[in-house]
């Protein structure tokens, strides 16, 4: 009779996961097998319940040595695993614009899951994405009324780039294959996005990226624009980099240029007065498609449904995600001018016009979440609320001018970037130390380089704005 394996029970992990995981390993000839306990499975050969998850954009070893776990959320607050309330100063990752766990959205998702859990949109359809596309089109600048659904901002960008390459080919301009991005641009982590993006660390480990890509300079200029409220006065001439690239490569080789109207992830880089308008003029002059990456700026962040509409510059394509579903279900979208959409559709005599898509494009749960989110934005007037609060937010942010280490403050809409002087021996360390100090004291901020980026849910109250900047001011005093 074969003997049963010996079960060796380990001590439950300490810290934030102690109440969640119980781990057992089965010894058998020196190897370990997984044992299911209370619905959990221990990883083969390991006794660490955090080891399996390879975390994105994270120093995994440092995090897992001292984890910071969020276990629930409501309104303006997260709750940590040790029971503390954490005021959300970043809308999660620029995405929970209406606040957390809004029942209007979660109920819509539950209803959709119980009605139609999945339906393909390849050669079939279901009603929700058609309805959502109409609702989205109505929020876009005039003419951008054709909507393609994705599952993330990265997918939205790669979709937009592929559409931008398909359009000139459909028009018989097949030499237009070049894409233009910008230094310090962030356009997600797909191969298209990292290629047009201007962040070397996002490309370094992955080869050369797409061929035929060039970059304009960024607009960040502390020397001339420090402590600007709203649009900086200096730097519109940097848009002429696009004309320089036209002169270098030939307009007939350039398909599209992509920029974030406001670069959020790389430190709240706000466009100078006239910059976006000049880009639009150069694109018009040379027949170049202009793409605005509004994954961050869409859905109220700068006070309107889109930065394009709010700031009066209409691109040819807009990418979206994040606030589209209030981050309750992953979803992205691409809005395209009707005449450009029609050029692709009409270039094919029959059959599939664009060989591109995703299994989950227009997913029922995501579409339901999107519709409920748009309803909530409209019912509560959150875009207008962001505009109304912008002045108070701006004053509170700029009240930190003169505080220790601060070399610049930038604000627009309900966004702020607080730039810290880099520590000579350890660039980026100050912002990361402030990030940790804020979390330990009940405030979530975002550290990007030497910049603290802030973008609270649009439901933020003035007292909470005071708390955000008050804590930052207080905690900066303890940062070397």
Name what the model sees in each region:
Residues 1-3:
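Polybasic, low-complexity intrinsically disordered segments
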Residues 20, 25, 31-40, 46:
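Short, positively charged and aromatic/hydrophobic N-terminal segments
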Residues 43-480:
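Conserved N-terminal phosphate-binding loop of PLP-dependent enzymes in the Aspartate aminotransferase
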